[in-house]
Amino acid sequence: NVSLIGGDFKVMPRGSLDKILITGVGLGISKKPIPDNELRVGDKIIVTGHVAEHGATILAAQLGLLDKVKGLKSDTRSLTKTVLKVIEEFRDYVHAARDPTRGGIASVLNEWARTNNLTIRIHKDKIPVRDEVRDFLEAMGVDYLSMASEGIALLAVDSGRAHEVLERLREVGEVNSEIIGEVMEPANNFLKGRVVGITEVGGKVLIEPKSINLPRIC
């Protein structure tokens, strides 16, 4: 017998929800669990949609700017009928899958690189981000790579099947999916466990998570 105890804290405006919330958790047995960090050299990194949508929206709301900045909307949604479906179809070729929530894709990529002692190279011009989101976050001095997304996933996929997975994602409705990078053997000790970004003009920069004080609103 095992006792399962869990809890969570939410920050809500006064008067909006001054009651006890009861949540539930489900446990099950998976025949083929989806890994979250089993990267291999050569894997392609796929993002299934526009990044930073949720984080930008929450930041605008926190600053009282949501009504003044056009085009911002949280991307919170279910991925079970699209992304999960494709992962299950290509289960043997998907080596890692994560949702880039708090900390954005920068956090997930760095965790993957550190855990596996590999280098991940990202092509920044391939990352799907809407102009409205990028412009707002740049004006606020915030890196969109570190902002939360609630309706996309990051995948590390065998290079031999990555383009097939990409096309399948687009077929099921994830039309903004893109291959944004690849997993590499570190060229030296400094690059071990690092994420390197190739800029739009061909320069190289380290991509590291940048913290920003946002409430955990899901």
Where are these regions (language model features)?
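Active-site-proximal betaalpha loop/short-helix elements
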Residues: K73-S149
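A short beta-alpha structural unit
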Residues: E150-A156
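General beta-strand structural signal in soluble alpha/beta enzymes
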Residues: S3-G7, I46-G49, A96-P100, I122-K124, ...
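Active-site glycine-rich loop that binds ribose-phosphate moieties when present
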Residues: I22-I34, D67-E89
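Acidic, Ser/Thr/Pro-rich beta/coil linker or hinge segments at domain junctions
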Residues: E171-C218
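Glycine-rich anion-binding loops of enzyme active sites
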Residues: N1-L59, E182-M184
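Helix N-cap motif at beta-to-alpha junctions
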Residues: V157-A162
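Solvent-exposed alpha-helices and their adjacent loops that cap or buttress functional pockets
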Residues: P13-K19, D36-R40, I58, V86-F90, ...
